[in-house]
């Protein structure tokens, strides 16, 4: 699969036609989706829209997949929940609106866990999404369908969003690039009242340049999202042409609390020190507060509040593992919800010291390799018992702080499974994270390696 930036140039130059490209994508979906289960709804008008595409626009008819919790006018948007089984929005999300204005053709909607609540892509409506690198293993989540579609080579770009790791975890498990932009960088409207203050819109791509291209087209303030940030009046895509120089990078294998698969740790350590070409890399010992319980408390209470008096109805159709969350909600109080803000400040106080001394922080993206479908996660890592979400300890801290953070492929395990490295920037330094990512991509390319399907 070529870079989206190159495909766009071919579309503009007439070397390929948008309708031909869309037809090729649909053929791949027909052939590969029965194996990986990435798509849950297709846009029946995609070919018709591609024939009308304006090749003078920035995307010139490029096909893009949209995660099924991002609303698409006239295309079913289910949130992968029985509650929304037949919901067809009357307006586009801001993200989709901007993509269409830029000339994108929406090819369809991608699979995810119900309401995007967990980092494992499965639900009662559509079933699990399978990892193209090993069909017996998970893609993670919650942007799992999008990651599978791009990893399988169906198309170069798919949308995702990230409230606790939901772009970065699938990127790690599927061997892709996935940036969680700064909170507010891309307007988020409309959205469910879940992961409030944590949620960022973004993309899954094979190339850093393609993520930069897409963000150039969708970033910037919108009156419908009061927390959206003003646009930065420069191009990310042009900015990453220049490698960083003289940067100071801290590498932490565990943030001070994580239990990590030794193979994951070693691969990420090797990858991190490849960045010494662009500055100084130092392994550091951290002792950050772990906000795992705060994440669980926040999500559970927000979901219970959102479902409200339809709880009995939802319990009959919900993804079975969610029923445990509902039981947990009975023991939680909104006092605990409010105290999350205190813990966020504790976390940032600890991180502030790191980012006063270093420009970037590198960690593993996930503490383990992709695990088998049918499990919500491993029960232990390196022979040590972990909590139910102890396998994903590196991503959610930076949802609480709102910092930009990306997963980029660090290498592959002995079994041939992707392993991701997380690059975290200072608040609002999205362009810096993209620059470091592009620099790493240039010294450690991975894009020519594809799964066999």
Curated annotation (Swiss-Prot):
It catalyses: a monocarboxylic acid amide + H2O = a monocarboxylate + NH4(+). It is an enzyme of class 3 (hydrolase). Keywords: Hydrolase. One of its GO terms (molecular function) is amidase activity. It comes from the Archaea. Its EC number is 3.5.1.4. This is Putative amidase AF_1954. Belongs to the amidase family. PROSITE patterns: AMIDASES. The keyword DNA-binding does not apply. It holds the Pfam family Amidase. Disulfide bonds: none annotated. It comes from Archaeoglobus fulgidus (strain ATCC 49558 / DSM 4304 / JCM 9628 / NBRC 100126 / VC-16).
């Amino acid at each position: 699969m070529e870079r989206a930036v190159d495909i766009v140039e071919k579309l503009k130059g007439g070397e390929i036609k948008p309708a031909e490209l869309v037809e090729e994508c649909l053929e791949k979906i027909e052939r590969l989706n029965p194996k990986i289960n990435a798509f849950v709804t297709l846009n029946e008008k995609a070919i018709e829209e591609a024939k009308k595409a304006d090749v003078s626009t920035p995307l010139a008819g490029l096909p893009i997949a949209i995660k099924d919790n991002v609303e698409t006018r006239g295309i079913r948007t289910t949130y992968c929940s029985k509650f929304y089984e037949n919901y067809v929005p009357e307006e586009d999300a801001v993200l989709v609106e901007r993509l269409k204005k830029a000339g994108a053709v929406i090819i369809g909607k991608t699979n995810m866990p119900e309401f995007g609540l967990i980092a494992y892509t499965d639900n009662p409506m559509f079933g699990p999404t399978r990892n193209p690198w090993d069909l017996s293993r998970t893609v993670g989540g919650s942007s799992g369908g999008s990651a599978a579609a791009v990893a399988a080579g169906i198309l170069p770009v798919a949308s995702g969003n990230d409230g606790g790791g939901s772009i970065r975890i699938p990127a790690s498990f599927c061997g892709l690039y996935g940036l969680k932009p700064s909170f507010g960088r891309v307007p988020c409207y409309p959205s469910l009242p879940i992961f409030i203050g944590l949620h960022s819109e973004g993309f899954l791509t094979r190339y850093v340049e393609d993520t930069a291209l897409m963000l150039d087209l969708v970033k910037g303030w919108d009156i419908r999202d009061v927390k959206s940030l003003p646009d930065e009046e420069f191009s990310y895509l042009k900015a990453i042409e220049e490698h960083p120089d003289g940067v100071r990078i801290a590498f932490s294998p565990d943030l001070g609390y994580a239990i990590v698969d030794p193979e994951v740790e070693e691969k990420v350590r090797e990858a991190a020190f490849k960045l010494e070409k662009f500055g100084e890399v130092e392994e550091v010992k951290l002792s950050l507060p772990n906000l795992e319980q705060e994440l669980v408390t926040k999500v559970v209470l927000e979901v219970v509040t959102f479902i409200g008096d339809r709880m009995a109805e939802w319990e009959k159709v919900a993804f079975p593992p969610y029923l445990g969350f509902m039981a947990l909600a009975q023991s939680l109080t909104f006092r605990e919800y409010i105290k999350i803000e205190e813990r966020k400040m504790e976390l940032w106080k600890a991180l502030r010291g790191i980012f006063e001394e270093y420009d970037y922080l590198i960690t593993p993206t996930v503490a383990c390799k992709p695990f088998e479908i049918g499990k919500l996660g491993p029960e232990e890592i390196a022979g040590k018992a972990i909590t139910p979400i102890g396998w994903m300890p590196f991503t959610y801290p930076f949802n609480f702080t709102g910092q930009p953070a990306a997963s980029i492929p660090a290498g592959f395990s002995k079994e041939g499974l992707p392993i991701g490295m997380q690059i975290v920037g200072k608040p609002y330094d999205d362009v810096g994270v993209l620059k470091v990512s592009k620099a790493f991509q240039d010294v450690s390319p991975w894009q020519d390696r594809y799964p066999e399907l």
